[in-house]
Amino acid sequence: MTTVQQIYEEMQRIAPLALAESWDNPGLLVDCGGEVSRVLVTLDITPEVVEEAARKGCGLIVSHHPVIFSPLKKLSGQDVAFQLVKNGISAICMHTNLDAAESGVNEVLAGIFGMREMEAFAEGCGRVGSIEPVTVPELAKKAQKELASRCNQPFNGPAVQVKFADTGKTVRRLAVISGAGGSLFEDAIAQGADCLLTGEANHHHAIDAKRLGLSLIAAGHYATEFPVTTAVAEKLRTAFPELEVLVSEDARDPYTYL
């Protein structure tokens, strides 16, 4: 049997805590201790995911988004941390450190688009490099297809919704920042990118990026980050052959798309 602490130490090798942003809260956030034989890897720890872990006999959940972020002032039965402890399930959460890590969230995302000569930028949280020349609409369609195939399918509607702001330039140098990376468009411009592909960007990010000559693709927070769960699961299977590592089937995008 493998202990929670052993898995936590391995996760720190995969995504060193030193890579995390100062405001972040990664780590072993719920520690029920002991040994586990089965682990569930997910993007978010929701009540549905806790129920799935309990149903499948998983004593540990490894997630990207922290289950505890702001200081807790009270705890009730509706809180996910409470539900974890009630079910005896520990939680390891690796957030911005996994964004920045080698083979982490952004390197997995970059690999989906065949990025070459990959470099880190935006203080390590993004990746930029060369891709085969492609138009922005073509790249957006590829994002929708490739990301949808790597995400849990919703009960209704499409799995991924992609929107883009197109300067009309062919994309040869692509920047990717998973999740809410739209505000970092100027960092992508500084790296000579033709396009920034991210999860979320607001109205003004798109206007300003396009005005400055950068195309912008927003493919969804969930969709740009969930693919890393498979990569993390594979790393844990390699490190602990005796451990059964599952990727959550009940972790879904909270949005429904028309």
What are these regions (language model features)?
Residues 1-258:
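Hydrophobic structural segments
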